[in-house]
Amino acid sequence: MTMESYKTLEIIRKNTDSSVFHLIINRPSHLNALSLDFFIEFPKALSSLDQNPDVSVIILSGAGKHFCSGIDLNSLSSISTQSSSGNDRGRSSEQLRRKIKSMQAAITAIEQCRKPVIAAIHGACIGGGVDLITACDIRYCSEDAFFSIKEVDLAIVADLGTLQRLPSIVGYANAMELALTARRFSGSEAKDLGLVSKVFGSKSELDNGVTTIAEGIGGKSPLAVTGTKAVLLRSREVSVEQGLDYVATWNSAMLISDDLNEAVSAQMMKRKPRFAKL
């Protein structure tokens, strides 16, 4: 399957035998600031990877010195100018709301992607970068990584997902403190808060370590992996009883599969399982 080219992103498959694909924010000269083009291209790229049977896991990273410096200020200014240019304030406000909803949907595309999306963070992860990683399924960073929920310093209420997703990751009080102060915090603090699962010593160690983890996930049953993601996301929004009912329904449809037979056979024969692509 031919990979489409993008202005703001790059898709790389580092090993032709691997089912791990890298989705890279590729605006290093702009510190990977998120432009309007990004919000159009990002969900398209994720959908392409989601539908590609060769893909089992996606690693999201940034080109150059930083993961993401937040929303592109020129794009932010453009949105503000367009929304205030009309004479009818009601219509201008409705237009702005549609733009915000469209940008929100671009971030939520991470959760809507069936395949696991792992964030590999180095350098700055600011504002919109935090929106991105809080939607990811797993997060890792290098020792030089730093984070900031920067929106209040731009007189904005963060509106692309951080305020909705971060409390369930780091706790309500921690999320409130970080969002109101906009303070910079380190990778080690992010680990202590539970925002990232591990801090690697360098970017190269991050790249190698996350790739190894992704390869491990990619070697498991794709039905089990995508199902686990779907059930966890669903369980976040419902009661325990409703979550149990959901997974019972899920497994009643998915459990009896060739993957189950292959996994059991591989365990008994002490060999690596071989699962069909999804």
From Swiss-Prot:
Function field: Converts 3,5-dienoyl-CoAs to the corresponding 2,4-dienoyl-CoAs. Involved in degradation of unsaturated fatty acids.
Classification lineage: Eukaryota, Viridiplantae, Streptophyta, Embryophyta, Tracheophyta
Site (Important for catalytic activity): E151
Residues modified as N-acetylmethionine: M1
UniProt-listed InterPro entries: ClpP/crotonase-like_dom_sf, Ech1-like, Enoyl-CoA_hyd/isom_CS, Enoyl-CoA_hydra/iso, Enoyl-CoA_hydra_C
Listed Gene3D superfamilies: 2-enoyl-CoA Hydratase, Chain A, domain 1 (3.90.226.10), Lyase 2-enoyl-coa Hydratase, Chain A, domain 2 (1.10.12.10)
Subcellular location: Peroxisome
Class in the EC hierarchy, top level: isomerase
Source organism superkingdom: Eukaryota
UniProt xrefs under SUPFAM superfamilies: ClpP/crotonase (SSF52096)
Name of protein: Delta(3,5)-Delta(2,4)-dienoyl-CoA isomerase, peroxisomal
Principal location class: other
Record-annotated disulphide pairs: none
Organism the protein comes from: Arabidopsis thaliana (Mouse-ear cress)
Gene that encodes the chain: DCI1
Family matches, as PANTHER family: DELTA(3,5)-DELTA(2,4)-DIENOYL-COA ISOMERASE, MITOCHONDRIAL, ENOYL-COA HYDRATASE
Record's keyword annotation contains Calcium: no
Tissues showing expression: Expressed in roots, leaves, stems and flowers.
Catalytic function, reaction form: a (3E,5Z)-dienoyl-CoA = a (2E,4E)-(5,6-saturated)-dienoyl-CoA
UniProt GO cellular component terms: peroxisome
Keyword entries, A-Z: Acetylation, Fatty acid metabolism, Isomerase, Lipid metabolism, Peroxisome
Annotated EC: 5.3.3.21
Pathway noted in the entry: Lipid metabolism; fatty acid beta-oxidation
GO biological process, one term: fatty acid catabolic process
Annotated substrate binding sites: S69, G70, I71, D72, L73, G128
Family affiliation: Belongs to the enoyl-CoA hydratase/isomerase family.
Motif Microbody targeting signal positions after renumbering to this chain: 276-278
GO function terms (MF aspect): delta(3,5)-delta(2,4)-dienoyl-CoA isomerase activity
